Amino acid sequence: MGRKASEIIDLLTEDHDRLLVLFAAFERLRQGGSEDALQTLVEIACTEIVVHMQVEEEHLYAALADAMNDLFLLEQAEVEHAMVRRLVAEMETMQAGDRLYNATFTVLANCLTAHIEHEQTRLFPLMEGLDLPFDSLTQDLRMHRHELRSEFGMPDTDPDDEDEGSYRYHVARRPHYRHH
């Protein structure tokens, strides 16, 4: 794969990996953590999801739409994002301990996990052969992600500072974490 395409893919895969770590942490907390810890983790995960999807849609998907002949895979990814957004909106109306809270987040995690697999195995490999402005696209993705993470009070993570892929968050719970 071209170096330029791989830079974008690495950036987005870092987000995907962060989400998968959060989903695994949710499963552990669901089986024995406090409701407060569960609520905080879900809020963090939903914020991560919203930031990632917005950056991806506004930059990568827009560039892919201009460069791809067959838009079916991209359209499928957009529909998956819409489904995930609906589930995030549903989570925003709930509190840990509510009926269906754990089930709703589990469905959200499952939908997003399938979407991640779809992107990484079908959509990302197509990028290599496309005529995309990789340098500016990578810069735009990084900058917009940083801006959104700052806006939501989320620390930017530096993979070199982390221990073997574990992500640490130092975010105070926000009672109004709506992303709309």
Predicted features, each with a name:
Residues 1-180:
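Small-residue-biased structural context
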